[in-house]
Amino acid sequence: MELHIDEKRLLKIFQDNNRDEFNLNELEKFMPKEKILRVSLWLKGKNLVETEEKVKKIIKLIKEEEFPERKIANYLKQHNIKEIEIKNLKDILPKEEINAALGAIKRKGIARIEKGKIIFDNLDYKDVEEQLLQKIKENKYLDDFSEEEKKIIDILKKRGYVDFDEEKEIKIKLTEKGKEFIKNPIEIEEEITQLTRDIIISGKWKKAYIRPYDVKVPTKPIYPAKVHPLTRIIREVKEILLAMGFKEVKSPIVETEFWNFDMLFEPQDHPAREMQDTFFLKYPNEGDIPEDLLSKVKEVHERCWKYKFDENVSRRLILRTHTTASSIRYLASLSDEEKNKPHKVFCIDRVFRNEAIDYKHLPEFYQCEGIIMDDNVNFNNLIGVLKEFLNRLGFEKVRFRPAYFPFTEPSLEAEVYLEGKGWLEILGAGIFRPEVLEPIGIEKPVLAWGIGFSRLAMLRYGLTDIRDLHKNDLDWLKRV
């Protein structure tokens, strides 16, 4: 049987002392306590020893000063008198000890209390409580006292002289297999557990026993510093899109309704623009917008939606509700020459919705938006790009179904298949409507899509509540 050198040392203690069992505190003179516990656990796994734990009640001395009744007797003895008026006890004892002294005198019968006086017949009386306190100094285990003594110990506890505590007694015993094992000589030879340069050069390794490593032994998990799970997904998506040839763009968090809604052909009376869905800035409450572009967008809205376009609504400042505003800003910034070139851009950033917080909604979350502009791109190209993107994210089964979005036509939703959960919606996409592109002078088709990171993170980490993604649960953050 392969034994560690410390296992051999512990078993040799049993062998040298011709004993089958030891208390832990007895073994501590041979080996440190922590090592004994660790080695005995190894030997227990090999069925060579067994351990037995017993919890013992111990008595702790809280104070060792004289009883107040003994203080009275000693005072009288010093003054060669045998009685004292109760009202004069304040000269001998603190106020809080007087009642305790009177109660003890009555209970023990060591003096008489008559006509407001305490009268002692014997100032050198014997007190079993004092004798027991002395015994407790020499023996702390409650089980070693008689039932009568335990009653007195309870009195001492009430008087605040002692208290109880618990102590574990651990016994390490040889099993039958262990007893058989120590019948044979146990040799403690030099053992090398870690090869060093000096050991190799000196040649010590030739004569010593080199302990083999068990690579299957469980080890304590190590939790190094980690990036937050949501940040990891954002970085992963960014790397995938950059590898697919996209360029990252940014736009402001605070937007005008013009860039967030009007430019995307969303009518000004659309429900999504109401207070319950959008955060409006109180101050400043209006922003600047390009007047020439405003007039073009106004003309498209009034011609197609048949309503009176309000320019003041367009100037209102809000927290952006989607990152599509980044895409449309990018397209509007292109020069005539740049409009003739293909473009692939994406934006990953925070968006805001005025929604009640629950298991699947937060007022602030991350979104990814991407567009592709080229002469010959079509709906099939959009499906192909999205399928490749989702495959790279680790979703093998992907399917698409028709959908409706105000600023794309045709539109679709992508679903991914997860074992045990079935098909789940993950992103929306489509081709920008001509009414979106007309005011900025773009005639080429533009493919667009968007994905929410919160939903993606929930799928990736198996969460059922989106709020868990933002909790300070260190155990979960260490594991994922």
Curated annotation (Swiss-Prot):
<feature type="binding site">
    <location>
        <position position="432"/>
    </location>
    <ligand>
        <name>L-phenylalanine</name>
    </ligand>
</feature>
<keyword id="KW-0547">Nucleotide-binding</keyword>
<dbReference type="InterPro" id="IPR006195">
    <property type="entry name" value="aa-tRNA-synth_II"/>
</dbReference>
<feature type="binding site">
    <location>
        <position position="324"/>
    </location>
    <ligand>
        <name>L-phenylalanine</name>
    </ligand>
</feature>
<dbReference type="Pfam" id="PF01409">
    <property type="entry name" value="tRNA-synt_2d"/>
</dbReference>
<dbReference type="InterPro" id="IPR022917">
    <property type="entry name" value="Phe_tRNA_ligase_alpha_bac/arc"/>
</dbReference>
<keyword id="KW-0963">Cytoplasm</keyword>
<comment type="subunit">
    <text>Tetramer of two alpha and two beta subunits.</text>
</comment>
<dbReference type="GO" id="GO:0000049">
    <property type="term" value="F:tRNA binding"/>
</dbReference>
<keyword id="KW-0067">ATP-binding</keyword>
<dbReference type="GO" id="GO:0004826">
    <property type="term" value="F:phenylalanine-tRNA ligase activity"/>
</dbReference>
<comment type="similarity">
    <text>Belongs to the class-II aminoacyl-tRNA synthetase family. Phe-tRNA synthetase alpha subunit type 2 subfamily.</text>
</comment>
<keyword id="KW-0030">Aminoacyl-tRNA synthetase</keyword>
<dbReference type="InterPro" id="IPR004529">
    <property type="entry name" value="Phe-tRNA-synth_IIc_asu"/>
</dbReference>
<dbReference type="GO" id="GO:0000287">
    <property type="term" value="F:magnesium ion binding"/>
</dbReference>
<dbReference type="GO" id="GO:0005524">
    <property type="term" value="F:ATP binding"/>
</dbReference>
<dbReference type="InterPro" id="IPR045864">
    <property type="entry name" value="aa-tRNA-synth_II/BPL/LPL"/>
</dbReference>
<keyword id="KW-0460">Magnesium</keyword>
<dbReference type="GO" id="GO:0005737">
    <property type="term" value="C:cytoplasm"/>
</dbReference>
<feature type="binding site">
    <location>
        <position position="409"/>
    </location>
    <ligand>
        <name>Mg(2+)</name>
    </ligand>
</feature>
<keyword id="KW-0479">Metal-binding</keyword>
<feature type="binding site">
    <location>
        <position position="407"/>
    </location>
    <ligand>
        <name>L-phenylalanine</name>
    </ligand>
</feature>
<keyword id="KW-0648">Protein biosynthesis</keyword>
<keyword id="KW-0436">Ligase</keyword>
<dbReference type="InterPro" id="IPR002319">
    <property type="entry name" value="Phenylalanyl-tRNA_Synthase"/>
</dbReference>
<protein>
    <recommendedName>
        <fullName>Phenylalanine--tRNA ligase alpha subunit</fullName>
        <ecNumber>6.1.1.20</ecNumber>
    </recommendedName>
</protein>
<dbReference type="GO" id="GO:0006432">
    <property type="term" value="P:phenylalanyl-tRNA aminoacylation"/>
</dbReference>
